[in-house]
Amino acid sequence: SEVGINPHGKHFETSLFESAEPYTITDINEYLYSAAVIIDGRMPHHEAIDKFNANKDYYMAELRKPLSDTPSVSELGEWLYNTRLADAIESYYNGEETHFLLSEDCTNGGLQHGGIGFHSTEMMIPANVGGAPEQLDSHGMLQAKLGLTSRDTAKDIHQPLLHGSSMHTLASVLECSVREAEIFVTKAYGKSVLNIEKIADWGVAVATNNNTSLLWKTRDGFNAQSIAYVETVPLTIKFIADRNSQGWGQLLLHKDMPLLKSVKGELVYGGGSSSNKAKVGGTVKNRGLYANVTHSVDATALRDIIRATGGKGLWKHDNFLVPGLMTLVRQTYRQALLAEYDFKAYDAAMVDILSNYNGEAPAKPTLVYGDATKDSIINSHYYLAP
């Protein structure tokens, strides 16, 4: 049977890809930084490079540690990447070319884009775009600030929060009341973080039968949309079939369908029970506006980097795997963040949605902006990391 390898998949899949053309490493420090951070954890660039140079044999041996007899999928990915990184470093010292793709990704891209979009210092600092002199761990900081039991719990909060989930959802994760959930997130990220729920709520309110696709333009002029729909609605298809006595047959399909409401504002399909067949269907997906604007901002930054590098690399969301171009990637990503600060993507998207709207829409919410300046981004160095 065929086995597919997904270039946008797990770590072990992306680690199998390499540059089609060999290249000579010119800035070895980028590779040494990655090696030291992978083995010892986050640290400043200069410290990582000094540590590697002081004990090269140790780091090379650690990168090439044998795989266990029963590795997990995660361990397999780490082993593949680490051994290939060691081979690339060795190629440099031997004066040889390499095909290796060096990888760095955003340190919580969702928090970066929300923070910059709302000029929120409280959000930007833990996302490593607020001018901190060292690389920070946004999950660990949230754990400490809210007194959570584990870093994984902080991840469980960040995921729904940064995708526009309601305070009801966050309250269930935090096991508290809705009001307490609101207090918790504002304690962590200031009042601007409440813009997320406002935008998501507005996206639900403006999604109607005549406006199932909310349309806007990205900073670089591409079209973007957020679609309100119902997942896996059952559809019975009837067709002529002379092979049976009835003369017809039928087939049950499940299909995503655009959001559709009755004159009473009730869903025509989706969210019902088996006793109400008109409403039988899957999950209603109409709360995606905030997340989709964020994804469009992600994609804009990615296009900036692809243009700057001539398309050389493997592109996985906000994870960049490139052949000897990481310094250029970092510089370009910072320029994208600075442009994003000026553009105010979330507000701009809502303005565009209103201009494309069919009918009269609810007024867009007034967003709360913080006092962060562009200097915070200019003075940041760890927005991408191994």
Name each model feature, range by range.
Residues 297-316:
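Active-site palm subdomain of RNA-directed nucleic acid polymerases
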Residues 254-269, 277, 303, 330-386:
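C-terminal, non-catalytic extensions of nucleic-acid polymerases
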Residues 143, 279-287:
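Gly-rich Lys/Arg/Thr-decorated short loops/hinges at beta-loop-alpha junctions or inter-strand turns
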Residues 294, 308, 312, 326-330, ...:
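Extended, charge-rich low-complexity regions and/or helical-solenoid scaffolds
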Residues 107, 286-302:
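Conserved pre-motif C helix in the palm subdomain of viral-like polymerases
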Residues 135-139, 295, 317:
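Histidine-centered active-site/metal-ligand motif
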